[in-house]
Amino acid sequence: AILKLLQDTSICDYLDIGTGTGRLLELLGPRVKNATGIDLSHEMLNMARTALEKSALENCQVRLGDMYDLPFEAASQDVVTLHQVLHYADDPASVIAEAARVTRQGGRLIVIDFAPHEEEGLRQDHAHRRLGFGDEDLATWFKQAAMQANAPVTLTGDPLSVVLWSGTKS
């Protein structure tokens, strides 16, 4: 779904916030000039480095970084993704604002996360702070961050559905 969303987008600089195992870097890396994944977990960064080495993606790198204080200049990225990360945030609006800060004019910010759900076990077992997000929440946060929201794409699942919310920097 993300490849389809970006099929007509030229990407020089790509940032994956909360990269985890680096899966999106592996997926988008062949299409971009420079890709960086950041994460607060040294363990996840090591897993991502290993995956990128196996994939021989020399244009991709990973580094330690905080989603609330990204180590990048303003307007430095063509595409920024938050893949299954926002539900860990205490302040999702601030994360969106910081991601938008580093997105270039005309660039894309893509949030991939759960639709609203009732799976309370994810709080205890996986430290989720939020049980999904509504379209209205993301639209509001995008607007506050000077992003023009695009129509969300829902991937229906049972019991969890995932939504791709995207915005273009105005």
State what each model feature region is.
Residues 13-69:
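Class I SAM-dependent methyltransferase SAM/SAH-binding core
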Residues 93-108:
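A short glycine-rich, Lys/Arg-flanked "PGG" loop and its adjoining helix->strand segment in the class I
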Residues 90-93, 119:
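Short N-terminal helix/helix-N-cap motif within the alpha/beta-hydrolase-1
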Residues 68-79:
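A short acidic, Gly/Pro-enriched loop at the edge of an enzyme's catalytic core
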Residues 1-12:
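Conserved alpha-helix/loop element of class I SAM-dependent methyltransferases that forms part
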Residues 78-91:
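A short SAM/SAH-binding and catalytic strip from SAM-dependent methyltransferases
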Residues 108-165:
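C-terminal alpha-helical "lid/dimerization" subdomain adjacent to the S-adenosyl-L-methionine
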